[in-house]
């Protein structure tokens, strides 16, 4: 997001003015540059490697090409551009203690920075809304959000992000009017992101606070729905254990179906944990920076510049966390293993929808057993029965179980 008044550089190198030996000071300064260079290089590698792996997996394996994963691809693209075009130049700015790429690239680089941050955060918000509809309206979800609609939503996210970034920056609407900012704008080696209050507040609202409010509301609804589902399962378990033993013996599938339903609903715990990780990481990485971003334009001297830039980099690191958070599913893990040549041929791998043929294409195992990809519901939190088809004994609805007794109503593409 740029660096305001970066006269004292982020994570300052040791100051040798008080050291008795200038040679020792130089060595410490060089060691600092090398150490920070290694750390920043690792951050760049983590961002690029993780997001390239996500994009490649979704593009290569049909099993992963779901509506939700369209949004994951958009998120990974934003994070990948961040790792390729933003973080390396930011690292150079810090390590060299000056900007060496000229005024034009300074503003263009800043625009890309704001674009990627905004697109990444707003895509997270869209994913939250996607999960909300998948959980609250599972049997209408596929008609509510088709792949074409998902493409339109992604396009709108990038348009809004572009309007927030390139337009005001390239038109110089963001510029402050005090003398220090004017001097920086005119200097080729200065790329400190001085902004006026209107732009700082408006961009923070669009890029962070509004998506955060939406995410908090959506995920609170998700937790409410999940809690009701768990209560429903508890009630159905009580009815199940109250059944007459002879009735269970007459219908041997009843007990097996109930156990399958209960096991299926244990996925809620994993999904709730994932939602907590998503919210916690998102908030921890970006909330401190955007608070400081508002405070900084209101009271310039209150927040040290080093703190501002450090928090900005904590936000950058979020781009490396996203692949880990959103790719916890078995489908992604198997895809990653196959891409990295780490997967051994096994029945388990085939059972998860990946073949071991020469061209490494994925063959969804369900196609051979009546559980087609197109018939799946893109939700893993579901414990509800279709309207009007609820089993009084708490079993999985018959229309969601294939001929081999497997549940075909969900997919592990996200949670």
From Swiss-Prot:
> Which ranges does the record list as Cytoplasmic topological domains?
59-71, 130-150, 221-274, 330-415
Name-wise, this protein is Beta-2 adrenergic receptor
| Species for this entry | Canis lupus familiaris
Positions glycosylated per UniProt: 6, 15
Provide the GO biological process annotations: adenylate cyclase-activating adrenergic receptor signaling pathway; negative regulation of G protein-coupled receptor signaling pathway; norepinephrine-epinephrine-mediated vasodilation involved in regulation of systemic arterial blood pressure; positive regulation of autophagosome maturation; positive regulation of lipophagy; positive regulation of MAPK cascade; receptor-mediated endocytosis; regulation of smooth muscle contraction
Q: Where in the cell is it found?
A: Cell membrane; Early endosome; Golgi apparatus
Disulfide partners: 106-191, 184-190
- Gene Ontology CC annotation, any one: Golgi apparatus
* Phosphotyrosine modified-residue sites: 141
